[in-house]
Amino acid sequence: MLLLMFALLQDGELRKAEILSIRQRKDGPSFYVHYVDFNKRLDEWIDASRLDLSHEVEWPQPEKPEKKKTGVGNKAPSKNAQKRARADSRDVSATPDLLTGKNVNVGKAQRPSKAGGKENRDGTPLSMPIVTAEAISTDGTPKAESDDVEMVDVSFTDGKSIKEEERALGLMSREEEIERLRTSGSMTQNPTEIHRVRNLNRLQMGKYDIEPWYFSPYPASFSDADIIYIDEFCLSYFDDKRAFERHRTKCTLVHPPGNEIYRDDYISFFEVDGRRQRTWCRNLCLLSKLFLDHKTLYYDVDPFLFYCMCTRDETGCHLVGYFSKEKDSAEGYNLACILTLPQYQRRGFGRLLISFSYELSKREGKLGSPEKPLSDLGLLGYRQYWRETLVEILMEPGRETVSENELALLTSMTEKDVHETLVVLNMLRYYKGNWVIVLTDYVVEQHKKRLEKEKLKGARKIDPARLQWKPPVFTASSRTWNW
């Protein structure tokens, strides 16, 4: 347990905070604090004036000495127990298709391949009618407490419930843990993970000054610099302004070092191979680690493709965001990591990135899903995209009957993502012995409001006709780790 005391947020609110680190500077000591029940992106260095000593301070409790293990519990398992364990392991390792009773490759028509792993579960009938909320009675069907879809950041939920969930994680399997994280928006798989102190104070990238959110393994000497200069084209980093300006006079790169595969009047997409452009991709991963707490890969970039979205002007193509994708994903993921840079957030770029990843899946003829766990902001972005995409299809005139499988084929989403989105929106109901998709009044109203808003502001969408891209084919050596 760390030292707990009350500190003032930047808006003046008093919150309980953990002191993670202390450093001594010329102007006095400063404290690196994590605000309890808040996301780690709000961690910051504060001076002593923002600490409130009028409240009781919670001191760390001394660790209890470990009990010595006796020899009683170290007996070898009996032969019968070993036989039972072997039998259980044989049962578990059986072929999944045989366990579920599915008949594989027997007279099936060709269709886009699905994502692997747990992304495809058969949970609903093949075809379901679409009806309005007034057409059926909801007796016997559990209602949501509110028609609104609550997207709750896990960091703002009750602290007690979080601790109970964390204790329960110890009893979960890895697959169950991943499942919990992808639906909760947690930033890390390990709840006991030690906080990494944010090592950079401020970035200058192009015309923007940016405050980092998390730790990133830049050189240790950078932690003492007041500002870090990052070239917005080649992503090289400097802690000295003179060195940065000298670099800018020599650097000739004006766009990501890859093939431009999409261009419209607003944005461009570049495909960058991590094996061919290792330095640039590593610099990109270092930069994104400042804003993605769950990101662990920043050195071995060979097995990944990076799809970078840029805006254009007379000086060049300015990086807005990107997503990475494994060259050969065993689980069938169509996206490994996604980021919109903070200076471009809340402008609709995240939706364009997600939409573009599904356009690539459609071109490949596959069903895709993002890699788990999703960050809190990533989960919100995907849920919004899934909701809007499915409602658009269901609202098409003349569409009276549709199945989850058909929705997946139309959108390149996995059936699991389709099913979960319908459940979150409270659109699945059991009616007269069948499951039906219900377009609730709230969903229809929100869809109309979004269309009106798009007419006023103008919605930007990916135009599939402008995508000049074929699914790349890689050799075994080019899609493996560079070990």
From Swiss-Prot:
- The segments annotated as C2HC MYST-type zinc fingers are 228-253
Q: Where does acetyl-CoA bind?
A: 336-340, 345-351, 375
Q: Look up keyword Membrane and say if it applies.
A: no
> Which stretches are tagged as biased composition: Basic and acidic residues?
57-69
Instruction: Read off the Gene3D superfamilies from this record.
Output: 2.30.30.140, 3.40.630.30, N-acetyl transferase-like (3.30.60.60), Winged helix-like DNA-binding domain superfamily/Winged helix DNA-binding domain (1.10.10.10)
User: Which Enzyme Commission number(s) are listed?
Assistant: 2.3.1.48, 2.3.1.-
Q: Where is this site: Important for catalytic activity?
A: 337
Q: What is known of its domains?
A: The ESA1-RPD3 motif is common to ESA1 and RPD3 and is required for ESA1 histone acetyl-transferase (HAT) activity and RPD3 histone deacetylase (HDAC) activity.
Q: Which InterPro entries match?
A: Acyl_CoA_acyltransferase, Chromo-like_dom_sf, Chromo/chromo_shadow_dom, HAT_MYST-type, MYST_HAT, Tudor-knot, WH-like_DNA-bd_sf, Zf-MYST
Q: Enumerate the catalysed reactions.
A: L-lysyl-[histone] + acetyl-CoA = N(6)-acetyl-L-lysyl-[histone] + CoA + H(+); L-lysyl-[protein] + acetyl-CoA = N(6)-acetyl-L-lysyl-[protein] + CoA + H(+); 2-hydroxyisobutanoyl-CoA + L-lysyl-[protein] = N(6)-(2-hydroxyisobutanoyl)-L-lysyl-[protein] + CoA + H(+); (2E)-butenoyl-CoA + L-lysyl-[protein] = N(6)-(2E)-butenoyl-L-lysyl-[protein] + CoA + H(+)
Q: Which UniProt keywords apply?
A: Acetylation, Activator, Chromatin regulator, Chromosome, DNA damage, DNA repair, Nucleus, Transcription, Transcription regulation, Transferase
The protein's name: Histone acetyltransferase esa1
N6-acetyllysine occurs at 295
Q: Where is this motif: ESA1-RPD3 motif?
A: 278-299
- What is the role of this chain? Catalytic component of the NuA4 histone acetyltransferase (HAT) complex which is involved in epigenetic transcriptional activation of selected genes principally by acetylation of nucleosomal histones H4, H3, H2B, H2A and H2A variant H2A.Z. Acetylates histone H4 to form H4K5ac, H4K8ac, H4K12ac and H4K16ac, histone H3 to form H3K14ac, and histone H2A to form H2AK4ac and H2AK7ac. The NuA4 complex is involved in the DNA damage response and is required for chromosome segregation. The NuA4 complex plays a direct role in repair of DNA double-strand breaks (DSBs) through homologous recombination.
Q: What is the lineage of its organism?
A: Eukaryota, Fungi, Dikarya, Ascomycota, Pezizomycotina
Q: What class of enzyme is it?
A: transferase
Q: Which SUPFAM superfamilies match?
A: Acyl-CoA N-acyltransferases (Nat), Chromo domain-like
Localization recorded for this chain is: Nucleus; Chromosome
